[in-house]
Amino acid sequence: MNFLLSWVHWTLALLLYLHHAKWSQAAPTTEGEQKAHGVVEFMDVYRRSYCHPIETLVDIFQEYPDEIEYIFKPSCVPLMRCGGCCSDEALECVPTSESNITMQIMRVKPHQSQHIGEMSFLQHSRCECRPKKVRTKPENHCEPCSERRKHLFVQDPQTCKCSCKNTDSRCKARQLELNERTCRCDKPRR
């Protein structure tokens, strides 16, 4: 009985898979055109995956990490950045030509103000596969601020002084208080 149930289960799974495979389509090649039989040819795959500038959504905080008092709308922007594969493991896809682009972004200070302003971002216009640089990690002479909550702190590499990424005004905007020991926004003590 168990064998029969198992066989029926696997047969149904196979039929479902084959039905889905029949209707699924390969990625479009150019201008939304599809290849016959849903197979993307090798040279097309190779050309589209090789190192080149490609539109990438980039988080604004990644580009402006010090502007933590603002909330940005939208929170990420479409930028041309180098991406793709190189033909050798010893190579990496890097920009060889860059330019700036200015975009209008809404900056919101919670419960205070909001305005649309211009922000500049770096775009890659040309990319090449170049030998990977050997990255030696610099000797860090500072003790970490907190092992468990590194993401809440900023550390000055010269003085080793730890400070909170959160600000008192950011916590107060959410009706909370900044706990300077943990760098978290906590409920006010009564």
Curated annotation (Swiss-Prot):
Keywords: Angiogenesis, Developmental protein, Differentiation, Disulfide bond, Glycoprotein, Growth factor, Heparin-binding, Mitogen, Secreted, Signal. Gene3D superfamilies: Cystine-knot cytokines, Vascular endothelial growth factor, heparin-binding domain. It is found in: Secreted. One of its GO terms (cellular component) is membrane. It comes from the Eukaryota. Homodimer; disulfide-linked. Also found as heterodimer with PGF. Interacts with NRP1. Interacts with isoform 2 of BSG. Interacts with CD82; this interaction inhibits VEGFA-mediated signaling pathway. This is Vascular endothelial growth factor A. It comes from Mesocricetus auratus (Golden hamster). The lineage of its organism: Eukaryota, Metazoa, Chordata, Craniata, Vertebrata.
